Amino acid sequence: MTAHREAAGTAARAVGEGTRIVTLADRPDLVTAVPGVLDSRWPRFMLAGRPGHDVDLTDLLVRAPQHQVLLVDATDEVRGVGLSVPLEWDGSVADLPSGWDGAVTASADLLERGGRPNAACALSITLMPAVTGQGYAGEMIDALKRAAASAGAAALIAPVRPVLKARYPLVPMEQYLTWRTEDGEVFDPWLRLHLRVGGEVLGVAYPSMTISGTVAEWRYWVGMPLPGDGEYVIRGGLAPLTVDRAADLGIYREPNVWVVHREQI
């Protein structure tokens, strides 16, 4: 195995025995491992469908390597990724991007015109199943916050994908946000973690992410027949899939929750 040394003064940080978090700027050679991590957890349609933006996401992430964080184990295998992009944001709810797709589009435009970002937007934190539940999720949020701060950002915003929402796809996100545990905490554990480490809910982003495809493509992605027009509950979807067979089109419009981290940025 080839030995690698992270650049001094970067965001590289030990988070466990032999496990560390590095940025893509530290280890550009690890970019090829990112798709495999995403594929281990993301629903197939989120990776294969046509997104609601025309940005080459891999190119965008590579152009902002200091904003991408990787969880690397003792064998130098990538076990988790945290993806974020630079943005301009005035700090108000009104100036938030339209959602996940909007953040990707705005960041690509910013980099294309050479703008000066003052914020960062987290797109995803994804952990391989083998390391889930070991406390790394909070470390990855912290790593994205530190990466944002190192880049001069005043805030890290995120269109959060609540982890349990897929169990309740017919419940409006606004209603889902009001749910509480018996202890009075926010019901969703992923949102709850964001709040515990200093995040603040700003509101619902809808539609945050739009994915489209033909009826045949959707049938393959979701593994079920789609015999008529209308809405379908699909595995991994936070909201129903809408199918129009005459147009040979399926559209999935996902709601997310805007969260901002301002403290310690």
Q: PLM ranges: what are they?
A:
Residues L191:
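ATP phosphate-binding glycine-rich loop and adjacent ATP-lid/helix-beta elements
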Residues L195-G203:
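Conserved acetyl-CoA-binding loop of GNAT-fold acetyltransferases
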Residues T2-G99:
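Short amphipathic alpha-helix that is part of the acyltransferase structural core
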Residues L127-A130:
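Active-site acidic-Proline motif in GNAT/NAT acetyltransferases
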Residues G133-S150, A155-A158:
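Conserved acetyl-CoA-binding loop-helix of GNAT-fold acetyltransferases
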Residues L83-S124, P162-F187, A205-P227, Y232-I251:
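Conserved acyl-donor/pantetheine-binding loop and adjacent beta-alpha core of acyl/acetyltransferases
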Residues V260-I265:
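Short beta-strand-to-coil "C-cap" segments at the C-terminal boundary of structured domains/repeats
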Residues Q66, R253-W258:
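Short hydrophobic/aromatic beta-strand or adjacent loop that forms the aromatic wall/cage
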